[in-house]
Amino acid sequence: RTFQGAFDVKKQILTAALLSLLTAGLTAAELTVAATPVPHGDILRLVAPDLKAQGYDLKVVEFSDFVSPNIALDAKEVTANYYQHKPFLDDAVKSRGLKIASVAPIHILPMAAYSKRIKSLNDLPKGARISIPNDPANGGRALLLLQSAGVIKLKDGAGATATPLDIADNPKRLRFTEVEAAQVPRTLDDVDVAIVNSNYALGVGLNPIKDSIYLENKDSPYAVVVACRLGDEQNPAVQALVKALTSPKVKDYMINTYKGGVVPVF
């Protein structure tokens, strides 16, 4: 009986260990992604069930600014982030020494000009005030938009990170107010024109197609990307995220929900 009792105890231990291993195999791995709320947080929540089916529990960590998601990624607080275009990422890597990289482009958020005072950029009065993002990538993008509209002319060689100091010709003597990208929509009551990133426009109920007075060219190089730490580009979790975000389901959602405010590039 003593031998049989010892055998039964060992059998129970082995059974428990086997069940523990099986349960561990069935437990989904956590996939943490940093994002801005609209549209990125919404799109991520849309694909959560698809990632669950691939064995990942998606956790979305939302930020209201453009800096924190990259800091969190570099500090290994999240697995990936999804909120920024490639020029912004490149500038962050260069200026902050971050060890992060782009994995895949997902969509374009057309930048646009909005106003409560005029109906067209042609109606800008002399000395008009224009608010633009204060980071180099998005501020430069806003100035390039104004140049494409014929409102200003930039110096030769001034590219994606142009600043108001790079303006060569400003016939209407426009005055520029530089604020954090997330705060630009809040300046609409105080300026003649605000140049707003679409994610922040959508967040306050503005649609780039319906509500703007000038829209960025459709050939924009500013595709929003999934980013990860250097060396993690082939991480199965990161690849699963890219697969989920580039599905027909997501493309249909972007087109039908945002009506031109979010343009898929896959």
Description of each model-found segment:
Residues 37-59:
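Short, polar/charged alpha-helical segment
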Residues 60-71, 158-186:
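Short helix-initiation/N-cap motifs at beta->coil->alpha
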Residues 66-97, 112, 119, 142, ...:
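Pocket-flanking alpha-helical
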Residues 74-84, 128, 151, 172-174, ...:
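Alpha-to-beta junction loops
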Residues 91-103, 118, 190, 195, ...:
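Ligand-binding "clamshell"
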Residues 110-121, 223-235:
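A bilobed periplasmic-binding-protein/Venus flytrap-type ligand-binding module shared by bacterial periplasmic
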Residues 138-147, 245-265:
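Periplasmic-binding protein-like
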